[in-house]
């Protein structure tokens, strides 16, 4: 028996049903790599960030996520080079889908019970995605903006439903917009932390604090 088409599991009808001690025998998801490209590039290397955002409330199979990842990666490797981008998959397939197998051969009615005991066996995993939730994000240099958008446009064809491509106003994968990031960086308030940054709050030495207290209460 072949794999049941993913269109049968497209909509979020049931509650989340993750793998657990009650839900055993779940096959491994097809997607195993969620970060690829130049993952260790510093936050300064890749200021551009582009998101592929879902425009529907639906379920995406792990096979579709893997196909989209491969499609995006192949295009960027060919037209940008393998060290000029960092792709991050933003969805993880945790929801388990079930199948109630039915026999279709002659005399099947003697062997099976139809819809009696119809709670199926685990068949695969899908990711539940909301409207406005990013499916995948790419950070790169500004000179490769057109190539990144085209790679995500091609990856859209691997997913059901509608998606939109957003060019983020933020610096890379950080939470700061570009102007704000440059201000904080010039003030030495940011500390690089892999592909992100840590904010250094205004904590002075204790002597400076004591002096300020004396000035206030003098």
Curated annotation (Swiss-Prot):
Alphabetic keyword roster: Ribonucleoprotein, Ribosomal protein
InterPro entries in the cross-refs: Ribosomal_uL16 (IPR047873), Ribosomal_uL16_CS_euk_arc (IPR018255), Ribosomal_uL16_dom (IPR016180), Ribosomal_uL16_euk_arch (IPR001197), Ribosomal_uL16_sf (IPR036920)
MF terms (GO), sorted A to Z: structural constituent of ribosome
Superkingdom of this protein's organism: Eukaryota
Keyword Ribosomal protein: yes
Signal peptide as annotated in the record: none
PROSITE patterns to which the protein is assigned, alphabetical: RIBOSOMAL_L10E
A GO CC term attached to the entry: cytosolic ribosome
Record carries keyword Ribosomal protein: yes
Pfam family, one: Ribosomal_L16
Annotated CDD domains: Ribosomal_L16_L10e (cd01433)
A GO BP annotation: cytoplasmic translation
Similarity field: Belongs to the universal ribosomal protein uL16 family.
NCBIfam families for this protein: PRK04199.1-4 (NF003239), uL16_euk_arch (TIGR00279)
Subunit note: Component of the large ribosomal subunit. Mature ribosomes consist of a small (40S) and a large (60S) subunit. The 40S subunit contains about 33 different proteins and 1 molecule of RNA (18S). The 60S subunit contains about 49 different proteins and 3 molecules of RNA (28S, 5.8S and 5S).
Name of the featured protein: Large ribosomal subunit protein uL16
